[in-house]
From Swiss-Prot:
The keyword Transcription regulation applies. This is Serum factor response D. Residues 1-61 form the MADS-box domain. Its main location: nucleus.
Length: 446
């Protein structure tokens, strides 16, 4: 939509000729004023309109310090329609205040032109060319500054996207696309709209893989907290069951039996706490999301006791010295055989279980069920122990069973435990077997 070129000849239409005269007359007077002001020159301009229908016929411009040429002509003096001087430039051609212009071009009646401006743009017009030209010039510089800033942001976003693998890289990638759109908007003279578009938040970003990992990690941490709460609730239930057992024992037994029951209950509490701690330790660490490689199988105390009984009975048959009776240190441990020695003889609930030893591979969902079964079994063991101690205390009321702590590498304790296991018929040996197995489980857990 450029301006159509016209042929330089007389315009036949009077209306078009008058419009063209007004436009070009104003432009010619403006250029004459600029020449006088910028270059400190003396300019005199006289324009006469020969159109018969023109209301204004004569136009003149004189620079300062120059007499008016048309006033010296007496016949034409009164007919001068418009007279322009240097002071009329800002009133006619400039619609903005003087404070908006550069100070290099304003110096009173005559302005001094800087040499730097001539060196930078010798063919360009200064900012005193008018309001429209000044606005166009101002937007041109603003567009250049915006394009430079967009190029810098473009390069920075490229660097950030190449150097990072997290969500910030994806955000910068989308910012890069938005900056491309903004550069196109700047070419269409919409700088302000594009700047507002840059400040808008980006809502169309797809979640990256790291966001999914982060959400999965949050879900996993909540899963850990739920497991811990469930374990704490199971401990509270165990404590309440043990307290009920203690109350029943206080009603039916003597002081010696109460002391023994308290010791048994403390051992059961320690065993339950260690099982719960073991379940928490089987979880993957908090600092990393769970994976299939990090899931550790849980520890089942019921199957551990069956394994200990089988290994201990086999070690009595095949080991030559009491030092080799420990199942952790014996190199001559025989293969497992599904016999009656694999089951616990102390509790009736354990005899109902399977005689063969299943593989020690579990899921995290079965840990709490196993703990509940172990707790029920421990409570049944407490009841059976209470009946045994009642019978013993009726025969020997002054006798209390106190065993030293058993370690895996103590031959004396192993020999004592083996001697107690050789007599399964008596009730005191059954109680010693139960205490030995519980302490051995605690040592294996630690």
């Amino acid at each position: 939509m450029g301006r159509k070129k016209i042929k330089i000849q007389r315009i036949p239409d009077e209306r078009n000729r008058q419009v063209t005269f007004n436009k070009r007359k104003n432009g010619l007077i403006k250029k004459a004023m600029e020449l006088a002001l910028l270059c400190d020159s003396t300019v005199s301009l006289v324009i006469v309109n020969n159109s018969p229908n023109a209301k204004e016929k004569y136009f003149q411009y004189i620079s300062s310090g120059l007499p008016s040429p048309m006033e010296s002509i007496p016949d034409l003096g009164p007919e001068i329609s418009q007279k322009f001087t240097d002071h009329d430039y800002d009133k006619i051609f400039n619609k903005k205040e003087k404070g908006d212009f550069n100070d290099d071009y304003i110096g009173g009646d005559t302005a001094s032109h800087s040499e730097e401006e001539d060196h930078k743009s010798p063919s360009s017009t200064p900012e005193l060319l008018g309001y429209n030209h000044h606005n166009h010039h101002h937007h041109h510089h603003q567009y250049n500054n915006n394009s430079n800033n967009n190029n810098n942001n473009h390069n920075n976003n490229h660097n950030n996207y190449n150097n990072s693998n997290n969500i910030n890289g994806h955000n910068n990638h989308y910012n890069h696309n938005n900056l491309k759109l903004n550069s196109n908007n700047n070419n269409n003279n919409s700088q302000f709209n594009s700047s507002q578009h840059i400040n808008k938040p980006i809502l169309s970003i797809k979640p990256s893989q790291t966001q999914e990992n982060h959400n999965h990690y949050n879900n996993y941490s909540s899963h850990l907290s739920n497991n811990n709460n469930n374990n704490n609730s199971s401990n509270n239930n165990n404590n309440s069951n043990n307290n009920n057992n203690n109350n029943n024992n206080n009603n039916t037994n003597n002081n010696n039996t109460n002391n023994n029951n308290n010791n048994n209950n403390n051992n059961n509490n320690n065993n339950n706490n260690n099982n719960n701690n073991n379940n928490n330790n089987n979880m993957s660490p908090i600092g990393s999301p769970p994976s299939k490689c990090q899931q550790v199988p849980a520890f089942d105390s019921t199957q551990a006791t069956q394994a200990l009984l089988s290994l201990h009975n086999a070690s009595k048959l095949f080991c030559s010295s009491p030092e080799d009776t420990s199942p952790m240190t014996s190199p001559r441990t025989p293969p497992f055989s599904s016999t009656n020695t694999n089951t616990l003889q102390t509790s009736p609930n354990s005899q109902q279980k399977s005689k063969s030893l299943p593989p020690l591979i579990f899921n995290e969902n079965n840990n709490q069920n196993n703990n509940n079964q172990n707790n029920n079994q421990n409570n049944n063991n407490n009841n059976s122990n209470n009946t045994n101690t009642n019978n013993n205390n009726q025969n020997n009321s002054s006798r209390s069973i106190l065993l030293p702590p058993i370690s895996l590498y103590n031959s004396n304790s192993n020999s004592n435990s083996s001697s107690t296991l050789t007599s399964p018929t008596s009730s005191s040996s059954n109680l010693n077997d139960d205490l030995f197995l519980k302490k051995r489980k605690l040592e294996l857990i630690h």
